[in-house]
């Protein structure tokens, strides 16, 4: 399954979560799209549909294809320490595009992915163009010298509140780092990862 490229606001309303991170989609229309969306409540879902919806919420939040998402889920299951769902969250958050987003170098995850793809981002001084690159705590994430005047980057940094507890960022140098692995309570409070584990366990 390919990465979703359709209307994000409509999808946000269908899933009941802000995929942009701004919350504007749900503030304006806090109901599902369609003729029967504005009824004041969402229809009751089956157990399978609830699990699928939770999986889709997380997958679309990080903008991954089903194959990328499932492979990362399987990788998380091979980590011996910790819970499967929590480890899955950590792997999602330590992707290079996620760290670039958390540092405030991009205003959205798709924008962060584009910065990485186009070679604007360095890891420990070396250009990395793979959004799924796994960042380790202490690695320095910076902007390539010739890219430091790119307007979207500067605008994102200026607008960023930079309140992510597991990263540090120097706005003057346009560089930062993942200081430690995130704790579960610092991530996705509106996501129930146990439902995602149940979904994939059901598939076998």
Swiss-Prot record:
What is the protein's known function? One of the primary rRNA binding proteins, it binds directly to 16S rRNA where it nucleates assembly of the body of the 30S subunit. With S5 and S12 plays an important role in translational accuracy.
Which intervals hold domain S4 RNA-binding?
A: 94-154
GO terms of biological process kind: ribosomal small subunit biogenesis; translation
Q: What is this protein called?
A: Small ribosomal subunit protein uS4
InterPro entries from the UniProt entry: Ribosomal_uS4, Ribosomal_uS4_bac-type, Ribosomal_uS4_CS, Ribosomal_uS4_N, S4_RNA-bd, S4_RNA-bd_sf
Q: A Pfam family for this UniProt protein?
A: Ribosomal_S4
How this chain assembles, per its entry, is: Part of the 30S ribosomal subunit. Contacts protein S5. The interaction surface between S4 and S5 is involved in control of translational fidelity.
The signal peptide stretch is: none
Keywords, in A-Z order: Ribonucleoprotein, Ribosomal protein, RNA-binding, rRNA-binding
Q: Which GO terms describe its molecular function?
A: rRNA binding; structural constituent of ribosome
Q: Name one GO cellular component term.
A: small ribosomal subunit
The segments labelled Disordered in the record are: 22-43
PROSITE patterns, per this entry? RIBOSOMAL_S4 (PS00632), S4 (PS50889)
Family to which the UniProt record says this protein belongs: Belongs to the universal ribosomal protein uS4 family.
């Amino acid at each position: 399954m390919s990465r979703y490229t359709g209307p994000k606001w409509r999808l946000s309303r269908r899933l009941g979560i802000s995929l942009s991170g701004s919350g504007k989609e749900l503030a304006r229309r806090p109901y599902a799209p369609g003729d029967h969306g504005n009824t004041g409540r969402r229809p009751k879902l089956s157990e399978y549909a609830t699990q699928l919806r939770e999986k889709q919420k997380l997958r679309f939040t990080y903008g991954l294809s089903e194959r990328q998402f499932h492979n990362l889920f399987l990788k998380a299951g091979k980590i011996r320490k910790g819970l499967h769902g929590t480890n899955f969250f950590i792997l999602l958050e330590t992707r290079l595009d996620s760290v670039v987003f958390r540092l405030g170098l991009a205003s959205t995850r798709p924008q962060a992915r584009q910065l990485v793809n186009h070679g604007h981002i360095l890891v420990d001084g070396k250009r990395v163009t793979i959004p799924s690159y796994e960042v380790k705590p202490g690695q320095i994430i910076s902007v390539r010298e010739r890219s430091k005047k790119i307007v979207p980057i500067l605008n994102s940094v200026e607008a960023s509140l930079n309140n992510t507890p597991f990263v540090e960022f120097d706005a003057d140098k346009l560089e930062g780092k993942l200081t430690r692995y995130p704790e579960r309570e610092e991530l996705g409070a509106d996501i129930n990862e146990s439902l995602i584990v149940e979904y994939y366990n059901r598939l076998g």
